[in-house]
UniProtKB/Swiss-Prot annotation:
Sequence motif: Cell attachment site, positions: 499-501
Keyword Secreted: yes
Protein's recorded name: Proprotein convertase subtilisin/kexin type 9
Active site: D189 (charge relay system), H229 (charge relay system), S389 (charge relay system)
Phosphoserine, modified sites: S50, S691
């Protein structure tokens, strides 16, 4: 995790501090750290008045920019910094800010070098300078934050094709409606041996090269060694014999050196190269394969988000550190399809003392052990490699095939189909740490059928938030992708001490929120995110009744159906807590909760959308209660009905609603105290009207 550094200095005290002591305080290597919702890094917050150059327009300027660096000390690159400017910063202002930093540094006797200016991916620049100048740089206008550069690494340490491509797809050629394959895959990796028979004529080796020097003065740059990782992955994606998407065009960008090591800044420049290529010569669908991982990087994740918004599909390796993938980038970026690795038995890949990463930031797993592919040793040689790089290459190939058949598929549609048609429940979850098992998907990738074979199936996925803090007011937030509808929200706490969940609008987007309770250890928010064409969804809530009555809420608009129920407790006293109830018999289409809870109903209208409730209860001791939707129906909402037992919460696993129970030791519970899981199941029949099925 690394050693954290944080400082907050009140400026009236600054004149009392010697300059050297002040600098040490600002750049201290130890102290309390700050952690982002989706990662681990070190952050320095400054709130200092600018006194640079005596300029009147800056005398009142207070720097609120932050300094971030990788939490893994050995991966840091001190002396090279990515200066990220505010999103609205104009092109001329970027250049002026870089020039201003150079000028002011020169006045203090420092020489700095601007290595690259980012215009197209995000506003900012890459600079080589002394750490003594960080305080100066953080106080410049337009600066949002500065991130110290750090290393990224390659993630590699014939059953694979049979596993992901069913027999009936093996001989198929994927082409767009006009008969051509227009998909292009960009590979950010080592160099590639383009003359290998597997990929000859299919790979364009660009002139892009942004790599650090190899470690060690005696390192011998043997060509076959330099090309090994990239050549192998290119063969996995589009090789003639061992490729997933045979014939797909591939562009090679060199961002990893002969030792498989690169930098965050080099990866950023590579992504901007792709963006510039888009702007100069628009083409068909683009897939970017990122078979590398470094420590959590806010700017690398932001760059992936910006590129994804242009229609590019990014696929990344989860990482080979047998750790939470959310601690690494680009794996932790929500806009990236993140892939873990499995072996021939569909079990997590072990690589010595390490292995595949896991957790809520992983979307699915794919073959990544002993994968046969092109070898750079000769133009006809093959070799096996292992790791999440190979797994990500498989999914990139699958995505390329899907886009070849249907070029208009969006990132949200691709991800939902990959999840829906994956092989489920084959991974032994005991391999993962206990606290990560519920968060890690039990999914192994397969090639989905085309749209006309899916029959208009309603597609949903479960999105977990980061774990909230332990304070009584700590909240967790789970978000769907912009194209998805948030159909329900639930929460989960390992201690059972939580104050519920609800849906609210933040920045024009509906988000799922969960609230921790006094004495709790933290809570997760669990969102159910679905693709519902032409949907019109809304949230209705009723405050706590507080009069010995149940709290009721239903869908107000005509033709709207209930897709989920949530609740938020107004009281701290857990002894009176009861979960909200979905009354499918006496009160169809309503959410009903305890008198002390505010209850929320998620309601949607879409052509042919129909929903119903399914319940299942157990009165005896049980760690969990489950209820599943039938074939043809999709789980959109999951919660637990009232009972005397304290529950840990409820969440969706594929088409299964899981209610977790706290006091499993009590064997004397009556039927009235049964724990009942309640699922809302929906389906889409475009020819029918929206309806509630009783």
């Amino acid at each position: 995790m690394g050693t954290h550094c944080s400082a907050w200095l009140r400026w009236p005290l600054l004149p009392l501090l010697p300059p050297l002591l002040l600098l040490l305080l600002l750049l201290c290597p130890t102290g309390a750290g700050a952690q982002d919702e989706d990662g681990d890094y070190e952050e320095l917050m400054l709130a200092l008045p600018s006194q640079e150059d005596g300029l009147a327009d800056e005398a009142a300027h207070v720097a609120t920019a932050t300094f971030r660096r990788c939490s893994k000390e050995a991966w840091r690159l001190p002396g090279t910094y990515i200066v990220v400017l505010m999103e609205e910063t104009q092109r001329l202002q970027i250049e002026q800010t870089a020039h201003r930093l150079q000028t002011r540094a020169a006045r203090r006797g420092y020489v700095i070098k601007v290595l690259h200016i980012f215009y197209d991916l995000f506003p900012g620049f890459l600079v080589k300078m002394s750490s003594d100048l960080l305080g100066l740089a953080l106080k410049l206008p337009h600066v949002e934050y500065i991130e110290e550069d750090s290393f990224v690494f390659a993630q590699s340490i014939p059953w694979n094709l049979e596993r992901i491509i069913p027999a009936w797809h093996q001989t198929e050629e994927d082409r767009s409606p006009d008969g051509s394959s227009q998909v292009e895959v960009y590979l950010l990796d080592t160099s590639i041996q383009g003359a290998h028979r597997e990929i000859e004529g299919r790979v364009t080796i660009t002139d892009f090269n942004s790599v650090p020097e190899e470690d060690g003065t005696r390192f011998h740059r043997q060509a076959s060694k330099c090309d090994s990782h990239g050549t192998h992955l290119a063969g996995v994606v589009s090789g003639r014999d061992a490729g997933v998407a045979k014939g797909t065009s591939l562009h090679s960008l060199r961002v990893l050196n002969c030792q498989g090591k690169g930098t965050v800044s080099g990866t950023l420049i590579g992504l901007e190269f792709i963006r510039k290529s888009q702007l100069i010569q628009p083409s068909g669908p683009l897939v970017v394969l990122l078979p590398l991982a470094g420590g959590y990087s806010r700017i690398l994740n932001a760059a992936c988000r910006h590129l994804a918004r242009t229609g590019v599909v990014l696929v990344a390796a989860a990482g080979n550190f047998r750790d939470d993938a959310c601690l690494y980038s680009p794996a932790s970026a929500p806009e990236v399809i993140t892939v873990g690795a499995t072996n021939a038995q569909d079990q997590p890949v072990t690589l010595g003392t390490l292995g595949t990463n896991f957790g809520r930031c992983v979307d699915l797993f794919a073959p990544g052990k002993d994968i046969i592919g092109a070898s750079s040793d000769c133009s006809t040689c093959f070799m096996s490699q292992s790791g999440t790089s190979q797994a990500a290459a498989h999914v990139a190939g699958i995505v390329a095939r899907m886009l070849s058949r249907e070029p208009t598929l969006t990132l949200a549609e691709l991800r939902q189909r990959l999840i829906h048609f994956s092989t489920k429940d084959v991974i032994n979850m005991a391999w993962f740490p206990e606290d990560q098992q519920v968060l890690t998907p039990n999914l192994v990738a397969t090639l989905p059928p085309s749209t006309h074979e899916t029959g208009g199936q309603l597609l949903c996925r479960t999105v977990w938030s980061a774990h909230s803090g332990p304070t009584r007011t700590a909240t967790a937030t789970a978000r769907c992708a912009p194209e998805e509808e948030l159909l329900s929200c639930s929460s989960f706490s390992r201690s059972g001490r939580r104050r519920g969940d609800w849906i609210e609008a933040i920045g024009g987007q509906q988000v799922c929120k969960a609230l921790n309770a006094f004495g709790g250890e933290g809570v997760y928010a669990v969102a159910r995110c679905c693709l519902v064409p032409r949907a019109n969804c809304s949230i209705h809530n009723t405050p706590a009744a507080r009069a010995g009555l149940e709290t009721h809420v239903h869908c107000h608009q005509k033709d709207h159906v209930l897709t989920g129920c949530s609740f938020h407790w107004e009281v701290e006293d857990l002894s009176v807590r009861r979960q909200p109830a979905l009354r499918s018999r006496r009160q169809p289409g309503q959410c009903v909760g305890h008198q002390a809870a505010s209850v929320y109903a998620s309601c949607c209208h879409a052509p042919g959308l129909e929903c119903k409730i399914k319940e299942h209860g157990i009165s005896g001791p049980s760690e969990q209660v489950t209820v599943a939707c039938e074939a043809g129906w999709t789980l959109t909402g999951c919660n637990v009905l009232p009972g005397a037992s304290l529950t840990l919460g409820a969440y969706s696993v594929d088409n299964l609603c899981v209610a977790r129970v706290h006091d499993t030791a009590r064997a004397d519970r009556t039927s009235g105290e049964a724990t009942v899981a309640a699922a809302i199941c929906c389906r889409s029949r475009p020819s029918a009207k929206a309806s509630w099925v009783q």
